[in-house]
């Protein structure tokens, strides 16, 4: 029996793909000019100086979200961090991995804000070359992209940049410096920027270049600074509002409306018919001056207080004007001269 209302089948989640085999990736490291490895800045220090950009090697693997993303053991265990090797396209575990194999969503919340989306600890300051994990003192959403192989057509270059970097998240702003091979890309969240930085490091777009992807320095434009501060303030307000109880928020708004005299803004109050007021009663309508009683209520209280005081004074005045009874004359009234017995 067929029914008209057909329900679309639910899309099954696919397991994460094993991007590489454990023996496919060349794990040999290049020549390190440094003598000591600085665990704080995650780089070598000391030794001979060399051009770090000239010694870069093209990455052997690359992540393709539509093909590699899927569920892993982290979806069952509740781990909120993404897999760093998945972003680089070289995770051999696939669905058996203990980390997430997907892009961080805009609503993605991490248990520790001092770590990036991969679980790596951030530092107080950026590295001198603006590489590495980043800083926890600033929410950076902008990436610096260097060594871009430019195209004669500017529109084609813009399309190529947005196609390759738009795969890792929503791009809210971008700027291409034509003639310099440099571009700046701003993502919606810092988690997306961190993921894109690792995914596109030492990669190439449509050419054979090796991209230099770093964190961007702070924008010196005053307008951008004000907009960023406003955005962070709005995010904080939404986060605080999400943790508050709705009944508590409504009660607070009601109390504030009573204090400000703007009750009509929250509750619809029907206009009542004007009542006949006493001749001596002042009819004043004033705005609230703070507190639980507005100007009208205070005038009413003052009026009734003065009225009660006036009535009390009138009672005292009446008590003073009443004459006292003559006791002597009332005693003599019993001895009348018209009595026959006398």
From Swiss-Prot:
Zn finger (C3H1-type) ranges are 77-104
**A GO cellular component annotation in the UniProt record:** post-mRNA release spliceosomal complex
Q: For the region Disordered, what residue ranges are annotated? A: 1-27, 270-292
Keyword terms of this UniProt record: Cell cycle, Metal-binding, mRNA processing, mRNA splicing, Nucleus, RNA-binding, Spliceosome, Zinc, Zinc-finger
Where is there biased composition of kind Basic and acidic residues? 270-288
* InterPro entries hit by this protein: Cwc2/Slt11, Cwc2_RRM, Nucleotide-bd_a/b_plait_sf, RBD_domain_sf, RRM_dom, Torus, Znf_CCCH
Q: Name one Pfam family in it.
A: RRM_1
What's this protein's name?
Pre-mRNA-splicing factor CWC2
Natural source organism:
Cryptococcus neoformans var. neoformans serotype D (strain JEC21 / ATCC MYA-565)
């Amino acid at each position: 029996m067929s029914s008209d209302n057909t329900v679309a089948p639910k899309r099954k989640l696919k397991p994460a793909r094993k991007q590489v085999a454990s023996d496919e990736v060349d794990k040999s490291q290049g020549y390190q000019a440094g003598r000591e490895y600085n665990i704080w800045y995650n780089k070598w220090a000391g030794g001979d100086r060399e051009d770090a950009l000239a010694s870069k090697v093209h990455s052997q693997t690359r992540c393709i979200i539509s093909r590699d993303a899927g569920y892993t053991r982290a979806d069952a265990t509740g781990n909120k961090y993404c897999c760093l090797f998945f972003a680089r396209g070289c995770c051999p575990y696939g669905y058996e991995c203990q980390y997430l194999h997907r892009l961080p969503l805009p609503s993605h919340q991490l248990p520790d804000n001092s770590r990036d989306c991969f679980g790596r600890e951030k530092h107080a300051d950026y590295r001198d070359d603006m590489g590495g994990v980043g800083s926890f003192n600033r929410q950076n959403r902008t990436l610096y992209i260097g060594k871009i192989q430019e195209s004669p057509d500017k529109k084609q270059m813009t399309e190529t940049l947005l196609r390759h970097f738009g795969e890792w998240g929503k791009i809210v702003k971008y700027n291409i410096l034509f003639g310099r091979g440099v571009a700046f890309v701003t993502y919606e969240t810092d988690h997306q920027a961190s993921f894109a930085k690792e995914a596109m490091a030492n990669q190439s777009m449509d050419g054979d270049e090796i991209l230099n992807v770093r964190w961007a320095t702070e924008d010196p434009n005053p307008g951008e600074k004000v907009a960023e501060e406003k955005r962070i303030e709005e995010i904080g307000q939404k986060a605080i509002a999400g943790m508050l109880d709705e009944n508590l928020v409504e009660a607070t708004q009601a109390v504030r409306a009573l204090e400000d005299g703007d009750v009509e803004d929250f509750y619809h109050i029907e206009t009542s018919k004007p009542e006949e007021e006493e001749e001596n009663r002042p009819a004043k309508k004033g705005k609230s001056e703070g507190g639980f009683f507005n100007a009208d209520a205070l005038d009413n209280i003052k009026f009734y207080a003065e009225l009660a005081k006036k009535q009390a004074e009138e009672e005292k005045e009446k008590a003073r004007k009443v004459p006292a009874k003559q006791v002597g004359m009332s005693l003599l009234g019993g001895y009348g001269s018209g009595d026959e017995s006398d």
